[in-house]
């Protein structure tokens, strides 16, 4: 039944894709050239006419305060730009394209305009991107570890999220969350993080949606009928399946949450040895 569903989805995708080409639309792709948008988030210039926007939560609702103690708010002098995930008392996982010179990290926050008693703020002591300490612009490896300048303490609103013990199953029910825009193409940033439930999509479906995309080290997640997606401002945040971080919000098409256009996530399990080695001091 799963195979039949995948084949049916592929047929729909191919028909839709053929029509889009007939209408003069271009495929989206991404490369290593990063451009800062007016919203303080990164976009990727493509070699084609359509721009891929670094991701953003659509179709969801406010997260319960108690459901995101691992969610980290990344900002600088220009304001909020990304999210991250607390892995232990001194390490945060986010996307490499979220790298900035003056990052600050706020933990234990829900409403960004409210100060919480156990809220803690840190700055990076060390940043490691794309399996290298020197290069943070390889979009095929959109992952970054941030070592905090001092340890954080567990509290009511601060607690790490588990790394994956196995790769995610195709079709798994997962949740993505962040402070990204809740409307698209008009951008509306919420005061509180939003959560939305989506599914890990089969590789053939993902490949049909993005024919030029490399499938290495990435996941596609969303709903094929659209309406639910990560979006502008959600970059670096977690895709959570069965209580473990399986993905990092990376990129997608804009406007978000469109029919047959799922979001793209860095596949955390593919980097598990690197992550554990760094955290262990290797």
Swiss-Prot record:
<feature type="active site" description="Charge relay system">
    <location>
        <position position="235"/>
    </location>
</feature>
<dbReference type="GO" id="GO:0006508">
    <property type="term" value="P:proteolysis"/>
</dbReference>
<keyword id="KW-0325">Glycoprotein</keyword>
<dbReference type="InterPro" id="IPR033116">
    <property type="entry name" value="TRYPSIN_SER"/>
</dbReference>
<keyword id="KW-0645">Protease</keyword>
<feature type="domain" description="Peptidase S1">
    <location>
        <begin position="57"/>
        <end position="280"/>
    </location>
</feature>
<dbReference type="InterPro" id="IPR009003">
    <property type="entry name" value="Peptidase_S1_PA"/>
</dbReference>
<feature type="active site" description="Charge relay system">
    <location>
        <position position="142"/>
    </location>
</feature>
<dbReference type="Pfam" id="PF00089">
    <property type="entry name" value="Trypsin"/>
</dbReference>
<feature type="glycosylation site" description="N-linked (GlcNAc...) asparagine">
    <location>
        <position position="149"/>
    </location>
</feature>
<keyword id="KW-0378">Hydrolase</keyword>
<keyword id="KW-0732">Signal</keyword>
<keyword id="KW-0720">Serine protease</keyword>
<feature type="propeptide">
    <location>
        <begin position="19"/>
        <end position="56"/>
    </location>
</feature>
<feature type="disulfide bond">
    <location>
        <begin position="206"/>
        <end position="220"/>
    </location>
</feature>
<dbReference type="GO" id="GO:0005576">
    <property type="term" value="C:extracellular region"/>
</dbReference>
<keyword id="KW-0800">Toxin</keyword>
<feature type="glycosylation site" description="N-linked (GlcNAc...) asparagine">
    <location>
        <position position="135"/>
    </location>
</feature>
<protein>
    <recommendedName>
        <fullName>Snake venom serine protease BmSP</fullName>
        <ecNumber>3.4.21.-</ecNumber>
    </recommendedName>
</protein>
<comment type="similarity">
    <text>Belongs to the peptidase S1 family. Snake venom subfamily.</text>
</comment>
<comment type="subunit">
    <text>Monomer.</text>
</comment>
<feature type="signal peptide">
    <location>
        <begin position="1"/>
        <end position="18"/>
    </location>
</feature>
<feature type="disulfide bond">
    <location>
        <begin position="231"/>
        <end position="256"/>
    </location>
</feature>
<keyword id="KW-1015">Disulfide bond</keyword>
<comment type="function">
    <text>Snake venom serine protease that may act in the hemostasis system of the prey.</text>
</comment>
<dbReference type="GO" id="GO:0090729">
    <property type="term" value="F:toxin activity"/>
</dbReference>
<feature type="disulfide bond">
    <location>
        <begin position="174"/>
        <end position="241"/>
    </location>
</feature>
<dbReference type="GO" id="GO:0004252">
    <property type="term" value="F:serine-type endopeptidase activity"/>
</dbReference>
<dbReference type="InterPro" id="IPR018114">
    <property type="entry name" value="TRYPSIN_HIS"/>
</dbReference>
<feature type="glycosylation site" description="N-linked (GlcNAc...) asparagine">
    <location>
        <position position="41"/>
    </location>
</feature>
<feature type="glycosylation site" description="N-linked (GlcNAc...) asparagine">
    <location>
        <position position="45"/>
    </location>
</feature>
<dbReference type="InterPro" id="IPR001314">
    <property type="entry name" value="Peptidase_S1A"/>
</dbReference>
<dbReference type="InterPro" id="IPR043504">
    <property type="entry name" value="Peptidase_S1_PA_chymotrypsin"/>
</dbReference>
<dbReference type="InterPro" id="IPR001254">
    <property type="entry name" value="Trypsin_dom"/>
</dbReference>
<feature type="active site" description="Charge relay system">
    <location>
        <position position="97"/>
    </location>
</feature>
<keyword id="KW-0964">Secreted</keyword>
<feature type="disulfide bond">
    <location>
        <begin position="63"/>
        <end position="195"/>
    </location>
</feature>
<feature type="disulfide bond">
    <location>
        <begin position="82"/>
        <end position="98"/>
    </location>
</feature>
<dbReference type="GO" id="GO:0030141">
    <property type="term" value="C:secretory granule"/>
</dbReference>
<keyword id="KW-1199">Hemostasis impairing toxin</keyword>
<feature type="glycosylation site" description="N-linked (GlcNAc...) asparagine">
    <location>
        <position position="153"/>
    </location>
</feature>
